[in-house]
């Protein structure tokens, strides 16, 4: 009998409390859910991404082989402008850089899956990249150029209508081809990396390649493996930046380090070493 009375009293108290406070509590939760769930989801990455990288003690950097940004030199050393710059930034942030070669066409997928923490590899700051990732400010200048074999008659992209033109899949070069009235009428073939594009033109299996000026300056012409190739046209001017996951606070942290490295002359020294122009 005592147990029944106790149960009855407990139930009554619960109903009383629910009547007094339940409506307000439910309203508050509903309001918070309606106004804050999206913000919480968006801010989760911003609040945790830099900490996530620091707790690991390393920044996993996605790259493709691309001289002068990330490549292995004649002595077997992994080097390049982006390699050295990323290493300097990581030192300032107190983490180690880990460079992982990626498929450029699926770079954002790998970023979102946390296979990598950032894309740092002469990456053009396109509208699409800036809409789908958290990017740093621009740190270097670039342009898309047309490369052909020496001796090729070329006056404009109109000469390439119906010809075989190559570019790296998912690259700014591919976008330049798609956006040019004449190049859009070429027989376009995508390649895995920009260096494959040079190989195709040198071998005569492609008539032209559209790729980064920075790479072309470093890899073609007298004294290079592609001495028979030349730049004949400059298309879109552009700038490079680093991409982190959308909403990440790591991009702002890297921007702050960029400011330090510009102020102390480190970035200019690297630009001079690799024959690049820093962004304004």
Task: List the predicted regions and their residue ranges.
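Bacterial lipoprotein signal-peptidase II cleavage site
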Residues: 18-39
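Periplasmic-binding protein-like
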Residues: 141-148, 213, 217, 221-259, ...
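A ligand-binding cleft/hinge motif common to bilobed small-molecule-binding domains
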Residues: 123-131, 176-179, 202-203, 207-236
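Extracytoplasmic small-molecule ligand-binding "clamshell" domains
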Residues: 44-122
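Extended ligand-binding regions for polar small-molecule ligands
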Residues: 83-92, 164, 171, 217, ...
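Ligand-binding clefts/hinges and TM-proximal coupling segments of bilobed small-molecule sensing domains
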Residues: 42, 47, 172-192, 227-234, ...
């Amino acid at each position: 009998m005592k147990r029944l009375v106790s149960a009855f009293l407990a139930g009554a108290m619960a109903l009383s409390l629910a009547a007094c406070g339940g409506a307000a509590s439910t309203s508050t939760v509903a309001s918070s859910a309606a106004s804050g769930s999206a913000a919480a989801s968006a801010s989760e990455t911003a609040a945790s991404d830099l900490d996530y990288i620091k707790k690991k003690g390393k920044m996993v950097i996605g790259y493709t082989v691309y001289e002068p940004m990330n490549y292995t030199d004649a002595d077997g050393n992994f080097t390049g402008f982006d390699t050295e710059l990323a290493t300097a930034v990581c030192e300032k942030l107190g983490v180690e850089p880990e460079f992982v070669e990626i498929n450029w066409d699926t770079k954002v997928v790998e970023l979102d899956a946390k296979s990598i923490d950032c894309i740092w590899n002469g990456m053009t700051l396109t509208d699409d990249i800036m809409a789908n990732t958290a990017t740093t400010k621009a740190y270097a200048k670039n342009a898309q150029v047309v490369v052909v074999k020496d001796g090729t008659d070329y006056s404009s992209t109109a000469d390439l209508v119906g010809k075989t033109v190559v570019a790296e899949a998912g690259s700014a070069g591919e976008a330049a081809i798609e956006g040019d009235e004449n190049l859009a009428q070429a027989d376009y073939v995508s390649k895995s990396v920009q260096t494959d594009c040079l190989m195709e033109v040198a071998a005569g299996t492609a008539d032209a390649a559209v790729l980064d000026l920075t790479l072309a300056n470093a890899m073609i012409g007298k004294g290079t493996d592609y001495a028979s190739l030349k730049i004949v046209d400059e298309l879109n001017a552009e700038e490079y930046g680093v991409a982190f996951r959308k909403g990440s606070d790591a991009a702002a942290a890297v921007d702050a380090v960029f400011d330090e490295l510009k102020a102390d002359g480190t970035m200019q020294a690297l630009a001079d070493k690799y024959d690049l122009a820093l962004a304004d």
